[in-house]
């Protein structure tokens, strides 16, 4: 059975590695670095959904049953010191409870208003009676009251026992740790010293130990004693929580070793003071330990961008600050509510965000879809660390190499230049000198002719990309419109031109003038002929517009008849 479980664990680990490798292969980091986009290797994602609860009951004053009152004066002075620390904390807790408790206006038979606790606070959220801070505090206080009976029993038992540490469980299985860190010292050191060294010497040793304990108490729990809100527990406090052995966390919390490292590294184990007992000098803390769940096959990459040159102009690619990639998804990541450890991002919910399609294709290596903006000032970064070396825009910057400050001349066909320990040990960019890592290496992707997407203004990514897409559409439409106009201009060019129309108009005017002149000439000619023959006789040989009518059967018969008459 054990062998089978080990095999299953090995297969699961192998699948996790394969998924992580596939996800990391989605983003061509070397290719993007050639246009100034720097993407790191990425970290895994863990969701902190639920938490485990623990309670710590600190007994700050040891139980002393010494003969002749040895050490009583030192204990009184120590209690006075504790009062100055604990009284403000107790008053703040009383104020918190007074603010959270909501008075019910419903009167009882004795006309005395009843007091309701946590449920009334939750019920009045919509009415704005309780603030969110009060609700949060109310939840913690309600949980404390649920465990109050168990904690009270532990307090009672602590006053009757001489054990320094007791680990119990309440009714719901939550652990309650009772700490009496001074009790072992009293039992093992002070009591034997009374018979050997005398009462005065033993009292002095007790006073020194009480002072030392107060200092250690402030070191371990000082941040928690300074407020009634949640504060991260220190490693010293965690050690006391797990019986002075922090490795026991692995066995008492239902989580893995990597998760424990993450919550400790990010200080996500929170402690809240929920009770102060000035009679017994006991302080109760509620401890919440988050339970992490890793999302398989997901990486969150940190992305940044520097300027690069293309065709003699300086440009800048707009990318989201964080990229989330999984096998079937590539988008942005909102890590505002997340915390970052060395190996992972811990988030309260899935931080995935949608990004435009053009930006997805850009991140996947299609540089023609990358949204860019033209650089007009020096605010845009000019260099960044990548693969242990430096990637820099040495056309827009002054770059030097080596201890001799040799100037670097960047090929104008390349967007950026890669500088490593092998080709340039001491790197200088605009007067800033940097030493490259000896393990750094050059980018493996060959430089090609770079083409980029539309130019946009630097503003929220989604708006800019939509504007850029609209600009592309308008430009394409304008080009098609010009083609259509050109085609139309080729159709019927000889009569659609302006010169042709003018020529036609001139010809028509000339023809009209000629006709008018001919009519005038004919009219004047006829008039002159009539004036030259006043009797109305017109010679036969003279040309006239009147028709000469002759009979078709006789030759001159009509004229003869006319002469007889």
Swiss-Prot record:
Top-rank taxon: Viruses
Region (Fusion peptide): 117-141
SUPFAM superfamilies found in the cross-reference section: Head and neck region of the ectodomain of NDV fusion glycoprotein, Virus ectodomain
Recorded GO CC terms: host cell plasma membrane; membrane; viral envelope; virion membrane
Tagged with keyword Transcription: no
Stretches of the chain found on the membrane's Cytoplasmic side: 522-565
Region named Leucine-zipper: 269-307
Glycosylation sites: 104, 245, 449
Pfam families cross-referenced by the UniProt entry: Fusion_gly
Name of the featured protein: Fusion glycoprotein F0
């Amino acid at each position: 059975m054990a062998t089978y479980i080990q095999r299953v664990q090995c297969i699961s680990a192998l699948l996790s590695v394969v998924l992580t490798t596939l996800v990391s292969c989605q983003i061509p980091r070397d290719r993007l670095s050639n246009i100034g986009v720097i993407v790191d290797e990425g970290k895994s994602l863990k969701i902190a959904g639920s938490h485990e609860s623990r309670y710590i009951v600190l007994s700050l004053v040891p139980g002393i049953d010494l003969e002749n009152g040895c050490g009583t004066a030192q204990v009184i002075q120590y209690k006075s010191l504790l009062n100055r620390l604990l009284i403000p904390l107790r008053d703040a807790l009383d104020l918190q409870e007074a603010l959270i408790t909501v008075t019910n206006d419903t009167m009882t038979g004795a006309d005395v208003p009843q007091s309701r606790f946590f449920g009334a606070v939750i019920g009045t959220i919509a009415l704005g009676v309780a603030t969110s801070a009060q609700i949060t505090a109310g939840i913690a206080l309600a949980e404390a009251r649920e465990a109050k009976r168990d904690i009270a029993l532990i307090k009672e038992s602590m006053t009757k026992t001489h054990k320094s540490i007791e680990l119990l469980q309440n009714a719901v299985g939550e652990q309650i740790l009772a700490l009496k860190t001074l009790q072992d010292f009293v039992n093992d050191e002070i009591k034997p010293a009374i018979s050997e060294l005398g009462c005065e010497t033993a009292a002095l040793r007790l006073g020194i130990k009480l002072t030392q304990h107060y200092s250690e108490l402030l070191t371990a729990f000082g941040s928690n004693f300074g407020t009634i809100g949640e504060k991260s527990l220190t490693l010293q406090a965690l050690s006391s929580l797990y019986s002075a052995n922090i490795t026991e966390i692995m066995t008492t919390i239902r989580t893995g070793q990597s998760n424990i490292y993450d919550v400790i590294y990010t200080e996500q184990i929170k402690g809240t003071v929920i009770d102060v007992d000035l009679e017994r000098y006991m302080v109760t803390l509620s401890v919440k330990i988050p339970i992490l769940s890793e999302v398989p096959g997901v990486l969150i990459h940190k992305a940044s961008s520097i300027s690069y040159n293309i065709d003699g102009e300086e440009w800048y690619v707009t990318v989201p600050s964080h990229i989330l990639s999984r096998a079937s998804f590539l988008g942005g990541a909102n890590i505002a509510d997340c915390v970052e450890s060395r190996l992972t991002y811990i988030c309260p919910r899935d931080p995935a965000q949608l990004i435009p399609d053009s930006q997805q294709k850009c991140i996947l290596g299609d540089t023609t879809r990358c949204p860019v903006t033209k650089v007009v000032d020096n605010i845009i970064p000019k260099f960044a660390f990548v693969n242990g070396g430096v990637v820099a825009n040495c056309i827009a910057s002054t770059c030097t190499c080596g201890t001799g400050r040799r100037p670097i001349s960047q090929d104008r066909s390349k967007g950026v230049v890669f500088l490593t320990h092998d080709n340039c040990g001491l790197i200088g960019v605009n007067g800033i000198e940097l030493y490259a890592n000896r393990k750094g290496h050059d980018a493996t992707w060959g430089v090609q002719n770079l083409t980029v997407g539309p130019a946009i203004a630097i503003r929220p990514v989604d708006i800019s990309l939509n504007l850029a897409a609209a600009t592309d559409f308008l430009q394409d439409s304008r080009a098609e419109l010009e083609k259509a106009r050109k085609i139309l201009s080729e159709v019927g060019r000889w009569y659609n031109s302006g010169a042709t129309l003018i020529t036609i108009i001139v010809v028509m005017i000339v023809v009209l003038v000629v006709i008018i002149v001919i009519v005038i000439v004919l009219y004047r000619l006829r008039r002159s002929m009539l004036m030259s023959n006043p009797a109305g006789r017109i010679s036969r040989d003279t040309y006239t517009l009147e028709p000469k009518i002759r009979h078709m059967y006789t030759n001159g018969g009509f004229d003869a008849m006319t002469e007889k008459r």
